[in-house]
Amino acid sequence: KSFVEHSVYKLAETSQVQDRRLEFVLIDSAQLNAFAAPGGIIGVNGGLFLYAQTEAEYASVMAHELAHLSQRHFARGVEAQQRMQLPMMAALLGGIIAAAAGAGDAGMAAIVSTQAAAMQERQRFSRQNEQEADRIGILNLEKAGYDPRAMPSMFERLMRQYRYDRKPPEFLLSHPVSESRIADTRNRAEQYPGNGVQDSLRYQLLRMRVQLFYEESPGMAAKRFRGILDENPKLDVARYGLALAQLKSGQLEQARESLQLLLQKTPNEVIYNLAVIELDTAANRLKDAQERVQRLLKLYPNDYPLNQSLVDLLLKQNRSSEAEKVLDQLIKTRPNDPDIWYQIAETRGLANNIIGLHQARAEYFALVGDYDQAIQQLDLAKRRASNNFQLASRIDARQQAFIQEQAMIKQMLR
């Protein structure tokens, strides 16, 4: 998630997007898809990293989506875009997140309604919209320092791969690829110098992590990586993949050996260290894991994955009050992150702060689109706060805001 945020903000700086207050949601799906919606909502499937073979290809997809956003291809005809940010976020993405988080029927119902609304909106895309997004996206890629040829290259590969497929990825249904579109993007890309960034080690490491996340046979993957390393032992990405495969298959000491070889080269590389932290946690070496996290946080105090790792470790050691302090700092910079609100609810529950627990749950449920649950949680909070007029009034005001947002969503989906 941190990589997506930083990379999209980098693209946004050179894009035509005027309001760069963006909200990000990563969707746990191996299917290829990414989209940008009104209110600055950026959605990315894990599958994008599986299909985009280089960082420039990944950036080409995101630049294309930012172009849709900047030209308001989704939002034309929608009034008061700024006021609609949170409701639109919940309507378009909430059901998917809720289902992924185990919210069951509520999540699935939201998915059905939001997919229908999204499909209606996407059917309005014209060939002109896609050409405009391609043109602006290529310009943005070049300005951001990437090789714009990555866009036609990825389109061409996807067209060859899914030319005769009856069930192509959702991205290709909403963004159909044709010979003429590929030719047009290639002609535009060729107008720029070919000296932009194609790829990076960081992207390949993250891509490897996503691949191993969806890998169903880590033992077979480890065998494959060993074969690659036998031929070329200097391939750090393959060694990282081997370490993750070993970790996933329970070969903890072998994974440690693989990671140590990588850390000898770059001891402060966050990606490698996060894998060691995961390894130490799996081996119940929580003190070692926490010492590593705290050492790295001195170097990278604002690193989101490191802060999340610290919270997880503190909770595993029943140090909920310390975990909540870390989360309180995180939520100041990420107020619309449902993952953080979920963890805040957990820490408040462990601290027996029941009113705070219900308030945090309400924020979480609202962000994942389940307003009924959010409103219900605030009902429970108000009952507990009945003897505190000021607190009860604040809770009631928040509840009324949720009721209004829910009404706006229902009106939008009619």
Where are these regions (language model features)?
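Short pre-active-site segment immediately N-terminal to the catalytic Zn-binding motif
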Residues: 46-60, 124-128
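Alpha-helical linker/edge segments of TPR/alpha-solenoid repeat scaffolds
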Residues: 179-183, 284-291, 318-322, 350-360, ...
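Catalytic Zn2+-binding segment of zinc metalloproteases
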Residues: 56, 66-83, 101
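Extracytoplasmic and endomembrane cell-envelope/extracellular-matrix remodeling and assembly machinery
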Residues: 2, 117-294, 302, 370, ...
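Active-site recognition of the HExxH zinc-binding catalytic motif
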Residues: 44, 60-68, 72-73, 133
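Canonical tetratricopeptide repeat
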Residues: 241, 275, 309-310, 343, ...
